[in-house]
Amino acid sequence: MSSTSLAWPRTAKSSLLQSADFSSTSKGYDRLGRRAREKLLDREFFLSLLNSASTKREAKSYLARLKAQHSPKPQVKEPEKESKDDAPQPLPSGVNLGSFYGASRSVYDSPVFRHDSTPTPHREISEERLHLSLVKLTTPQLLDDYIIDGVAKTLSQLNRLGMASCVVVDPGAGDHPNALRKIAAEQADRLSNAIDALPDSKSAHLDSVLSLSSTDPDTPTVMSRKALLSPMRDGHIVVVAPIAYTDDVRAVVVPADNAVLALTKELAGLATRPDPDEDPWVTAQRIGDLQREVSLDRVILLDPLGGIPAFSGPQTSHVFINMEQEFDDIEQELLRVRESAASSNQPSASSLLDGDASSIADSNPISKFVNHDVVPVPPEQEAVLPGLRLEERAVDGHLENLSLSQKVLAMLPSASSGIITSPLEVANSAMAPQTTPSGLAVGTRRQRNPLIHNLLTDKPLLSSSLPLSRRAAINGRRGSLTAPSSHTTFVKRGMPLTLVPNPRVQTWTAQNRPRMSLDDPSIDLPRLVHLIEDSFNRKLDVQDYLNRIHDRLAGLIIAGEYEGGAILTWELPPGVEDDGSPASEARMVPYLDKFAVLKRSQGAGGVADIVFNAMVRSCFPNGVCWRSRKDNPVNKWYFERSEGTWKLADTNWTMFWTTPNLPDDLQRFQDYEAVCRSIQPSWADDTGVVD
């Protein structure tokens, strides 16, 4: 959403930009009165908020959720402990009767023997649930001050939006533990100072969070849950160095990934060790109380490498990763690239940085990515991993980020998500737009902040099913000549994806039709019917539909537990006989017959993207067509993902396709149109409404 869509007067908009830029420096901020400070803080905050949301509706929706989270809870009337008849009558005051009247304390304190166990009352959690993000900032010692300041500013804005943050500073690997410990402590102080320098922002650098046991010296644990959570409840951004203390009070540097895993385990309520003598119900109740106390909603990895790159297909990076479906494939892809980088005869990292990289750019698939997107390694860091070249270290970094995200999300609820991006991208989006001496903004706008955008929408900056050709205009700065591509990766534990038949075993072609039907035992037909009816909000004539697609089924895509899906068929244009001949098979049209997502899963979780990507990348990579009502509100989503569209004259249909260069093949185009015109719907209500 561009700033011009707010329809502000030019003077008001330039004033807002000027004030936002002025308020970003504490020096100018200190010269203002209290009321002026509050106004400037609010202006900058809401400007960033509106820039980071795709639509006004998303921003308003989040603000409504935020208000609901912090609304006062209704007071619950406590039940009377004793009935009126049983309660002791009050004695007249002014006369000390001692213990003569009424029961003595010894009676009240005497134990009561019961045959049954005394029920344990449920302990209500007095404090409201704390929503937080766990952040890992990799090698901050390599980052300029303005990047650290931009990261601090974004964390402060997240805090104001109701998302507390705990940041783990990662100094990287090295052979000198004492030097690493010093770097970690210095960088934690550096980030903490940057946060404290911001108006109305507070940090807490905790240096005694983790401990190491002699029985398990490789796995750190959290010393005190209360010491970790209390500062965040008070509005502080917690900064932690990956330093743990042993039983003999020695400070030891631990891998930052291990620190993140230990914090995740504690915040997820999974660090409690059950007592074998404790009632399992009591143990479950205790763990449940811990989990209701805190909600770890986001795991954010800020790494100079940025998001996870892609080396197969047209995309250059993974915008969204469904871990259940894609983790193994992406891991294997990165391992193959690393093996290629290790086996190729590459010069050293220093020679790459001196300008010799262009000669080998074509010989290694990661070279181009490294040359343009990795923060240069200073000479003093060159010997950190002397046995690895720059490309190998880059791939190793991506593998570590991918693995850490997978391990962390496996401990969290499915609603939690992860973000992998670069500190530079976060810092650039946190900077106010440049202004001219006259006070007018230059023809660029703020980049959408990937962290704030994700908090508002629970979606990636770009849809993963969006074609590469359409990403630049949406991702880049409107009005600029060049639109930088986003390397932010949004990660979800996600859901499994079922493709029937499996295209890796049997390709989806007209010659290899599976000759199956929807009442096949491998398909849960009642759940599939519920999915279709819930998505379309109409009753399906099941038998009529089964008859229509009989012997035409190309395959089925099911996301999760029938949360989304697609039914694809092979259709013949009217007048073409299905006689099994090569000529007949050549005329068959790949057709998307049903595309459905449960109402509760629409607009969130990326279910539609997961199904659509499977269809166009795995099942029908050479193209598929479908139709939709001309007034269907989903058409905007279809327009952005199709290669072309065609409004069918004298009908209420619009035809979409992903087949490259379809209009150049007149016969093929006419077959597509004939199929989209001729298919009859199979709805039980028979209202006459097409679709």
UniProtKB/Swiss-Prot annotation:
Per the record, the GO terms for biological process are:
L-arginine biosynthetic process; ornithine biosynthetic process
Q: Which Pfam families match?
A: NAT (PF04768)
Record's keyword annotation contains Metal-binding? no
Predominant location: mitochondrion
Q: In which pathway is this protein known to take part?
A: Amino-acid biosynthesis; L-arginine biosynthesis; N(2)-acetyl-L-ornithine from L-glutamate: step 1/4
Protein task: N-acetylglutamate synthase involved in arginine biosynthesis.
* Family that this chain belongs to: Belongs to the acetyltransferase family.
Q: What is this protein called?
A: Amino-acid acetyltransferase, mitochondrial
